Amino acid sequence: MNSSDVQMMSSQDAPGSAGLAPDNIASSLPSKKKSRRGADPTNQKRRCVSTACIACRRRKSKCDGALPSCAACASVYGTECIYDPNSDHRRKGVYREKNDSMKAQNATLQILIEAILNASEEDVIDIVRRIRTCDDLDEVAESIRRDEKNATATNDNDDSDEPTQPGRDDATSQAVEGERDLARKMGELRIENGSVRFIGGTSHLIYLSEPTDASEEPELETRLSTCDENPITTWTEVTKNPQLIIHLVNMYFNWHYPYFTTLSRSLFYRDFIKGKPAGQPRSTVYCSSLLVNAMLALGCHFTSVDGAFAVPGDSRTKGDHFFAEAKRLIVQNDEYEKPRLTTVQALALMSVREAGCGREAKGWVYSGMSFRMAQDIGLNLDIGSLDEKEVDARRITFWGCFVFDKCWSNYLGRLPQLPKNTYNVPKYDVFPDEDAELWSPYTDAGFDQSCKQPSRTRAIGLQLSKLCEISSDLLLFFYHPSHIGRSSGKSAELKKLSELHRRLEDWRTELPKEFEPKDGQLPNVILMHMFYHLQYIHLFRPFLKYTKEASPLEKVQPRRICTTNANSISKLMRLYKKLYNLRQICNIAVYMLHSACTIHMLNLPEKTARRDITHGVRQLEEMAEDWPCARRTLGIISVLARKWNVELPEEAAIVLKRTDEKYGMFSTSEVPSPNRTAPSLAPSSPAPPYTPEASLLFSTTAAAVLEQQPYSPMTLYSHPTPPHLGPESISDPGMSPNIVTFSDLPDPSAPIIPQQQQNMQAISSLSQNNMLHQHHHHLQNQHQPQQPHHNHMTYQQQQHNLLTHPVSASSMSMSDTLATITAWGIPTSSPGNNNNNNIVSQHPHHQKQPQQQQQPQAQRYPTVGSVGTNTVKPPAAATQTFTPAQLHANNLATATRSTASNHKSVGRHVSPSSIYAIDGQDWYLKDGVTWQQGFQGWDLEGGGAGTATSTGGIGDGGGPTGGAGDSMARLAPRGNIGGGGGGGGGSTGQRQQQQQRQQQQQQQQQQQQQQQQQQQQQQQQQQQEANMFAYHHGAERGGGGIESTGMGMTTVGGGGGGFDPIGGSGLLDDLVGLDELGSLDGLGHLPGLD
């Protein structure tokens, strides 16, 4: 009994289903039995078919194989019934066909392999070429088999003069092969004159034979073995001072290279320390005179040493002498005719330097030359047949050019020159060892080892390149010439807007946490985030043209988005200024800050816009000392303010007026490019002679080190302490007649003079007359008459107290040079000058100042008097006592005297010993030091009331509980950069009482006369504005309070000063006072968040 019989028996015994009568079931059973067991033998059992139809195979149902349509497709599903035996891979026939095909392929490959093995060297090249250019390998194998038969036939019929038919077939085959060669050869890389060049398939140059080695010069293994010159000084003709060269190279690698990563630092240093070859080598080199001079020209913009100026004392000529040498090399040495990797890199650096000097037209030409040459040598293509190090150098150079291109496109509003359809090269690899090398801020005073951290240069560069890809697509759509002046349609714009917005959000989400903007972050990371927010402004700025009714963005306000991101750029710029300083920043920051300031001007007179535009023009003024493009940016903002009829804040207007008078109306035509004749800098002392023994020692040491670790500059030149320049290293008397040293600066701790006391009294009277906010700006911007910026500090005054290893310009040997040059370091000073008398700290306020005679010294650094108060008390040993007003007047004198030192490009960070220093440079606090030292000294049981009369650049810490900060009684003048706001008392008890008293007074005044009531309200408003101004433009941060309870109310203690009004938190965002925390009136109300 089979399974169908069992099924039929079970169906007969089964009870009827619901809704069917037994009679119906009984009557239905014979019909089923009849249909299954009919007289037709074909219906008794489903026949087995070898191939089911495609529809049944897809449904995984049984198919009866009927033609033209099976029963399932015809009766049940009504689908098209198609049979395809070849699509069923389970059939034996299919496997048989595959087996035959594999045998044929095996025979073809066997013929080709045997032909290559048995052919001569000349014929092997021809066979390989035919294999590469063929359409079918079987035809090549058949052709080779016929050739072998023809060769056999020719040997058998030597006497026959009649050509054979296969010979004519071979001629025909060669003709067809030529057609294929012409059609299939798409491009190749070839070496010409020692460099790799790419020739495309449409060029007939591709069929030229490879150049022979006979025309090339033999490779020169020995480099300056008998020359009397330091290898480092062979790269430039401008100076023969090795310390100056190393100093400027370190400036470049410390501040510019991390953002514009366009070369392999390890390969560059490998060739840099060997010196310039005596002749043109055949092998690829990663250092050239053109590249070094371009680096030195850029490095001059981050330093104020004597050798950085082409004309002593003229900041407009920084780096011009090295740039002129680079231009000379391009023209006279025909560098533009020799496509090389180093030339691509040098031209890119020269382009961005020209932009920083306000010569965009020339910089655009240099960038175009760089990008064209990059494509000429095939950097945009993925070439895997080269050495790994060369492949890495080519990739990092291309992606560096890619970043340069996108920055240029954003800067000039032009289309990218390297769009994504022109390259297929992968991104460069991240080497953990290289990214783990420590980075620390480098200034004219040396390295700040307290801020060292992993550099992560390559990892950051990859993130920036991804962001530039988004920027490229944004520019190509919204800023394409075909899109300007006419819309592409709202639907297309919204679709592209949504895509780019999503990509920007994904980039931000996928960004590693270590690259978040935070206190102590790397400078290139901060600039990268500024570029990220700039893309949002560029993305939504085209939608500002729509009115609210016609805007395709119903629930999105483009102006608000642009404002938010402009505010973020301003916050990041303040963070950069706090962590480092704006004298050492890439010039791309000028453009990004300019974009943000433009949005701020549209939002005037809003409070946040007034704050940000004021800080923006002050920051641009600081950057203008090193980057002439910032001077023109200030002029543009001044012109726009008049054109748009915008009322700028008073302090911003004063800054613009001052810069207009100092720099004039900046014009590109007024900034000539340096000529091609580079002025030579005569060294202050003769360059040390190099003997053959010294050269041999250098070569031996270098070879030994390179053999151990050939491509790691940090391991190449390890040094126990940070090296430093000697006193005679960079100072050049012939170039700087007016040298400003720290000893020439007045003593900031000297007491005030009567004239300053009178000025202070005048300030108080103006404050009482409700004119404080006007005179406050005037005091802030009073300074000495403008004069050329002389920052030529000799390294005699800039030695670091930790740098003790002796290397002098006159006694430095080759081995010393190798031991002291690091990827981030410079040679050290001589022992004779490293004494206590000549040691100068990294910070100007730590240096020994001359004492003014006939005047007693005042207390320099304020001490925290009582817990929770901002009133500065003198130490017990002091013989004088000072009122808060006198202390503030002392600060004003300090600010006036320390104006010159504020512009120095030396130390930026506050040392723990001077956490409450009042110097102009120390207007911020280090967060870690603040809470480590300040918190333990607070009395958690209650403290004194914080006041607004801080005498320093910062507000002292207020008590976390107990008395409240005095927000209205005593408003501090600005001191150096503005008196810090009162430290936040935790509770609002006294503030609430004070507020109640004020309300009672207002009620009494209201009962007297309506006119007096209006006058009182106006005075109160002006007083509150002055209060907000004092804290708004005070120190970046006051001492913060903590959560506490006072008089039945719980509130967040106030960290006064800076951008946080009194009563603000001071805890949540105490980096640079980025967000406005707390009540806007400073009366101690429950604070909110920005």
From Swiss-Prot:
Residues 940-965, 976-988 have a biased composition (Gly residues). Residues 1-14, 666-677 have a biased composition (Polar residues). Keywords: Activator, DNA-binding, Metal-binding, Nitrate assimilation, Nucleus, Transcription, Transcription regulation, Zinc. It is found in: Nucleus. Pfam families: Fungal_trans, Zn_clus. Transmembrane segments: none annotated. Residues 53-81 bind DNA. Disulfide bonds: none annotated. Residues 167-176 have a biased composition (Basic and acidic residues). SMART domains: Fungal_trans, GAL4. CDD domains: fungal_TF_MHR (cd12148), GAL4 (cd00067). One of its GO terms (cellular component) is nucleus. GO terms for molecular function: DNA binding; DNA-binding transcription factor activity, RNA polymerase II-specific; zinc ion binding. Its main location: nucleus. Residues 1-43, 145-176, 666-689, 773-798, 825-875, 936-999, 1033-1053 are annotated as: Disordered. GO terms for biological process: DNA-templated transcription; nitrate assimilation. Residues 849-859, 990-999 have a biased composition (Low complexity). PANTHER family: TY1 ENHANCER ACTIVATOR (PTHR31313:SF81). The glutamine-rich domain might function in activating gene expression. Pathway-specific regulatory gene of nitrate assimilation; it activates the transcription of the genes for nitrate and nitrite reductases. This is Nitrogen assimilation transcription factor nit-4. It comes from Neurospora crassa (strain ATCC 24698 / 74-OR23-1A / CBS 708.71 / DSM 1257 / FGSC 987).
